């Protein structure tokens, strides 16, 4: 049976085990051999990264054809309006095409979220707000580009779920190991 690791990837870490040059890699947190990321989180993003020792499962998780939802909480610049939320829900025109519909809602600032190191830039004259967004595709820096396209740049991006797997109470750099009982 395949094994998975659920890692809370810290900010500034790249989603690979080697070749980080000046950036920290996954090898700083995971010493278990034979595990590979199923999908990516860019260096500036935090949260749930799923790794597996099974190629078929890795493909199912990362391939958009399987429509596995990935949910993020996102801190954005300014107070988001309903028009922007609706555009995010129905599809945003990006330079590589229109995004697929997403599930989006405004949320309060998450109380259980850890402090980011380094902290986000703060501009006292510009308020921020939070949204939760679930996407079913995985273009490069997709959510950052989506929020910027509707006029609300992303300041902080934290993935909290991949399919049925949840970040839970893992702190940055911590991981848990699970056994997958069946592949679809």
Map each language-model feature to its residues:
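RNA pseudouridine synthases
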Residues: 1-184
């Amino acid at each position: 049976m395949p094994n998975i690791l659920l890692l809370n990837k810290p900010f500034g870490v790249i989603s690979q085990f080697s070749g980080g040059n000046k950036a920290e890699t996954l090898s700083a947190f995971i010493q278990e051999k034979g595990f590979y990321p199923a999908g990516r989180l860019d260096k500036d993003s935090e949260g749930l990264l799923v790794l597996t020792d099974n190629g078929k499962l890795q493909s199912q998780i990362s391939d958009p054809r399987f429509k596995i939802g990935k949910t993020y909480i996102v801190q954005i610049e300014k107070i988001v309006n309903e028009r922007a939320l609706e555009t995010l829900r129905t599809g945003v025109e990006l330079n590589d095409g229109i995004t697929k519909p997403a599930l989006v809602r405004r949320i309060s600032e998450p109380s259980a979220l850890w402090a980011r190191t380094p902290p986000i830039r703060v501009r006292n004259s510009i308020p921020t707000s939070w949204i939760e967004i679930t996407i079913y595709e995985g273009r490069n820096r997709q959510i950052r580009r989506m929020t910027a396209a509707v006029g609300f740049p992303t300041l902080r991006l934290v993935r909290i779920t991949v399919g049925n797997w949840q970040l839970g109470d893992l702190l940055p750099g911590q991981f848990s190991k699970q056994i997958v009982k069946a592949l679809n």
